[in-house]
Amino acid sequence: MKKRIWLGALLAIPVLAVLGYVGYAEAAYYRLEDRLALDVDHQQGDQAQPDTEYTLLSYNVGFLAYSADYSFFMDGGEESRARDPRAVETNGQGVLETVREVSPDYLFMQEVDVDATRSWHIDEVELLTGELADYNRIFAQNYDSPYLFWPLTEPHGASRSGIVTLSRCRVESALRRSLPVETGFSKFLDLDRCYSVSRVPVSNGRELCLYNVHLSAYTTDGSIATEQLAMLLEDMEEEYRSGNYVICGGDFNKDLLGNSGSIFGVSGEAYTWAQPFPEELVPEGISLTAPLDEEHPIPSCRNADKAYDPETSFVLTVDGFLVSDNVEVTGAQVVDTGFAWSDHNPVKLVFRLT
């Protein structure tokens, strides 16, 4: 009888541990309110000007963990954190060097940690923008997770992260919009998805509305990503119909080229998250700009199930832009970094307000 009692007690321990963790995760989970006003740090600069060429760079920096030989457990790889603080610093300096070379007027970044186990509690917002004091800066939080005890050998831990918008032109105000997310257990693995809207006054009395976005990838319900995109496009269309200029840039987690496997030579059939971008959702007056050099195609993203191999890694373009018709696009390209500092290459847009 005593053996049975002891055996029952031993079996109950892991069950209670799991139940306790689920309770902890549920208690810690929350979402930020919709239509949250965002602070504009270093507010400065002039109004934007029509018929002036500007450059926008969008860069998913991958919480500064992804050197070219890094693989991530949620992509089927092995690692769950940056290897050490030095790796975060090295990747951060690589990102900064790329930004300085492009010298954009506007800069969007995604997956920028503020305080996270996975990035050794380094404030990446300060690391990446501290030397860029001549930009207006807007931070929008899209991830504040409870401690994730997986993988067991090196848990991913707790994360607070977000998206960052920088602008040389003056930003009068900024707003955070909450996107639809899953409601099941997957909500603990996905982010508190959002986009930010930064309003830049233009000398002709209109506004340039800059949308920084990072849509869902790890979902069990494929309709969530469609709902997110539909909400974003409805908002953009409303601003365009009001006479404003509208540009959205970021990581859409969709194959913007529609057939990246054919273009880059490695099939994506095994990667169900890499679905074609649903262009049928894009309303009149808004268009998709997917950067592609047809003679020398460069992808914007690699699947991080293994170290990057140019010959065998699945690559695609998920980073790009949605632009209103009153914005003239004069150039768009993927900046080739060889995935040295992130699992993404940055994408660049050159444009004029007409």
Regions found by a protein language model. Give the residues of each.
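N-terminal, active-site-proximal structural segment of metallo-dependent hydrolase catalytic domains
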Residues: 5-134, 139-160
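Beta-strand-turn-beta hairpins that frame and shape the catalytic cleft
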Residues: 46-56, 65-68, 159, 163-173, ...
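Active-site beta-strand/loop signature of hydrolases that rely on acidic residues for catalysis
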Residues: 55-61, 91-121, 166, 198, ...
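Surface-exposed cleft-lining segments at the edges of enzyme active sites
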Residues: 78-84, 112-114, 179-187, 214-223
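Conserved beta strand-loop-helix elements of the APE1-like EEP
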Residues: 130-133, 158-174, 284, 312-328, ...
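Short proline/glycine-enriched turn/loop segments at secondary-structure junctions
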Residues: 186-187, 307-312, 336-340
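Metal-dependent phosphoesterases centered on the DNase I-like endonuclease/exonuclease/phosphatase
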Residues: 219-325
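Low-complexity, intrinsically disordered Gly/Pro/Thr-rich segments
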Residues: 327-338
